[in-house]
Each structure stands twice: as C-alpha cells, then as structure tokens.
C-alpha cells in the first residue's frame, strides 16, 4: 500500500453518533474541508495536519484497535473493531479510498462521515457511509450532491443536522420526496445555532430569518409527525 494522507489526528474513543453509537472506535480525522458549515466544531481540521504514509496510518489503527480484536466485547459484537474516517472531508483526499479498502480487507468495520458534497460511488461497498444532507441553517444547502442518493443502500446512513424550524421542515420534505426511509437509517442531530458574535469568521453565517428550535421542540416534532428517524 503506497501513498499518503494529511492527517489531523488518530485516536481511540467511543462512537458518539450513528447506529454504531456507544461502541469503541478508532477515528482517523483527515485535514481539509471545502465546506464552511455555520455550526462546524472541527474548524481546526481545515488546515492543521501532518502528512503520514498509508502504511503508518494502517499500523496505528491496528495498534489502537488491538485490545478489541480478541476481547469478550468482540464476541458479543462482531462489528468490532470499528474504524471511522472523518474530517474535515475525507473524500477530498483520494488516498482515503485505498485506505478504506485495505482496512475492510483486514477485517475492520469501516465507517466514513462525509458532507454529501462529493461523489460517494467510488467508496468500497463494504464501507458504511454516513452522509450528511445539509440543511438551510448550515449555509451550505446548495452543496448537497443530489446524485449521491441513488448510490446509498441499507448499510449506509443519512444525517440531518437540525438547528432551526426551517431545517426540520426541509429535512421532512426531503425524506418524503426521496422516500429516504426506504433506503437506509436516518439520523437527526440537534445543534444550537450560533449568534453572529459567537461564530468563527471562517464559517458561513446562519442565514437570516430562520427560527431556532430547541432540543425538546425537535423531539416533540419528531414524535408528533411520527418521523422514521433516530434522534441523537
């Protein structure tokens, strides 16, 4: 395996989102993103990182995942060990593709978190693709690549980050229009929209005129509308 990636960090933690939430996971955070979502909490990964050879990354993942490869937890959950590529936007670096393939070949359950702004069709089909559909408050709704929806399957997941009433209504309309619940699990993640004075100047501003929604209000709406989503 030849080539390299610019990596922000590699670490072991518990998966906090998706249908894999709560499981141990090795995270590979890659550097660079071409979106500037208003609520981004990893802006440090836009530029900070170090070039690392794929073989070095692979070895580090194996080292961190080793305790879970033969543990009792592994016997209870065959999905372990988990590895997730995140960012930043992993698909901006083409060598993320052979790395994911190699990790799958080595028996890892591989996840990728991607913005939905780049073609996902070239990703190894064994990889679980957790793809965003950017809502209005992100400031990046125009970057959604609609053609990606046709490439999703039952092992993938779609994530909506909801911070306003308009986000909720937009997400609900997308679910209905594309019958998304018949494709894969759907995730709703709540976010508190930042006031202008709280926002980093490198991020898109929250579009004017949107109505913030609280976590409680979002949960109540999901229940009232019987939406087929997982609230996280």
PLM features: what roles do these ranges have?
Residues 8, 24-25, 31, 36-127:
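Conserved Radical SAM active-site core
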Residues 3, 24-26, 36, 184, ...:
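A generic secondary-structure signal marking the coil-to-beta-strand transition
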Residues 1-24:
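Short, charged low-complexity linear segments at domain edges
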Residues 1-5, 69-70, 203:
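Short, low-complexity, intrinsically disordered N-terminal peptides in bacterial proteins
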Residues 16-20, 32, 223:
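Short secondary-structure boundary/capping segments within folded domains
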Residues 80, 91-232:
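Conserved AdoMet/S-adenosylmethionine-binding subsite of the radical SAM
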């Amino acid at each position: 395996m030849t080539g390299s990636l610019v990596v922000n960090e590699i670490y072991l933690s518990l998966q906090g989102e998706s249908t894999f939430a709560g499981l141990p996971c090795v995270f590979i955070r890659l550097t660079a993103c071409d979106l500037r979502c208003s609520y981004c909490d990893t802006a440090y990964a836009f530029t900070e990182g170090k070039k690392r050879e794929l073989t070095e990354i692979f070895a580090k993942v194996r080292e961190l995942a080793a305790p879970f490869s033969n543990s009792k937890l592994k016997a209870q959950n065959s999905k372990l060990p988990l590895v997730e590529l995140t960012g930043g936007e992993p698909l901006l670096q083409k060598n993320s593709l052979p790395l994911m393939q190699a990790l799958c070949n080595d028996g890892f359950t591989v996840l990728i978190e991607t913005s939905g702004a780049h073609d996902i069709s070239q990703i190894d089909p064994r990889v679980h693709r957790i793809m965003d559909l950017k809502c209005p408050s992100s400031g990046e709704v125009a970057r959604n690549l609609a053609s990606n929806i046709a490439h999703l399957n039952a092992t993938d997941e779609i994530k909506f980050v909801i911070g306003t009433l308009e986000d909720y209504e937009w997400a609900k309309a997308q679910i209905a229009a594309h019958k998304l619940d018949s494709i894969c699990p759907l995730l709703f993640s709540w976010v508190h929209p930042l006031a202008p004075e709280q926002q980093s100047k490198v991020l898109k501003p929250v579009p004017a005129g949107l109505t913030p929604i609280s976590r409680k209000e979002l949960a109540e709406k999901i229940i009232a509308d019987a939406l087929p989503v997982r609230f996280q």
